[in-house]
């Protein structure tokens, strides 16, 4: 279980629980609701709860395989390796140097489960998709965690998942985005407004409409496109 407390902003009662619209916990929960509304299941089950330090959120813990155990050479879906050791079919996002001054490459797999997460990040305007926030569960699903600074009205997309930049969004995901737009025009938009501001709900709607009209993944804009640290 992961626990994240709320922080002050627009305190109000929602379904019997005191939450703060627009706080970290509210954004975590709203991001989870968007993932569920799309039917993608990217974000582990997330609930709002009152805890010993006040209102916040709890999230199902995700156990992951240790692909680096015993020096077997396995790679996580997002990882680093020597520049000359990038596996065939993987995306190289950037090159850097490690603490010993040796060159390394930041890479991620060309995996449809990870691609779905990247599309979700565009929709919820994720400003902090680090490599360590993409978890391959023991159940075979890929989960995203840490969405407390998503859903801002301004473009703040910052991610390590740039491998699909400039490519078309898969058709099945486009259908889901279309259905999300319809739901935002109705009760789901109202429900989200209990946890984020009305301007943020409107911005989510516009991002979805824009992506539906031109279903192509964005490219880095040159202004801090990678979170730091990257993991």
Where would I find each of the regions flagged by the language model?
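Conserved ATP-binding subdomain of kinase catalytic cores across diverse folds
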Residues: 1-88, 119-127, 138-143
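Intrinsic structural disorder
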Residues: 1-2, 17, 52, 70-72, ...
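Residue-identity detector for threonine
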Residues: 2, 17, 43-46, 64, ...
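Histidine (H) residue identity feature
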Residues: 7-8, 15, 68, 108, ...
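C-terminal catalytic region of ATP-dependent kinase domains
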Residues: 21, 137-231
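Generic structural signal for bulky hydrophobic/aromatic residues embedded
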Residues: 34-38, 62, 132, 164, ...
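Conserved kinase catalytic-core segment
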Residues: 37-40, 94-157, 204
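ATP-dependent phospho-/nucleotidyl transfer catalytic cores
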Residues: 52-123, 163-167, 171, 175-202
């Amino acid at each position: 279980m992961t626990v994240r407390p709320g922080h002050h902003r627009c305190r109000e009662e929602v379904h019997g629980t005191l939450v703060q619209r627009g706080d970290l916990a509210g954004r975590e929960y709203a991001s989870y609701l968007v993932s569920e509304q799309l039917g993608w299941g990217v974000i582990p089950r997330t609930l709002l709860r009152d805890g010993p330090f006040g209102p916040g959120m709890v999230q199902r813990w995700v156990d992951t395989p240790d692909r680096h155990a015993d020096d077997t050479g396995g790679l996580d879906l997002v990882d680093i390796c020597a520049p000359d050791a990038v596996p065939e079919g993987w995306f190289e996002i950037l090159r850097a140097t490690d603490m010993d001054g040796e060159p390394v490459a930041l890479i991620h797999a060309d995996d449809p489960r990870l691609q779905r997460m990247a599309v979700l990040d565009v929709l919820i305007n994720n400003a902090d998709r680090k490599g360590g926030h993409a978890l391959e569960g023991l159940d075979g699903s890929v989960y995203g965690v840490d969405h407390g600074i998503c859903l801002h009205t301004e473009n703040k997309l910052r991610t390590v998942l740039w491998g699909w930049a400039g490519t078309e969004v898969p058709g099945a995901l486009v259908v889901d985005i279309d259905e999300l737009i319809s739901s935002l025009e109705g009760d789901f938009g109202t429900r989200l407004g209990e946890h984020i501001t009305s301007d943020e709900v409107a911005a989510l709607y516009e991002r979805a409409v824009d992506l539906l009209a031109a279903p192509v993944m964005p490219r880095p804009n040159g202004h801090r496109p990678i979170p730091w640290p990257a993991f």
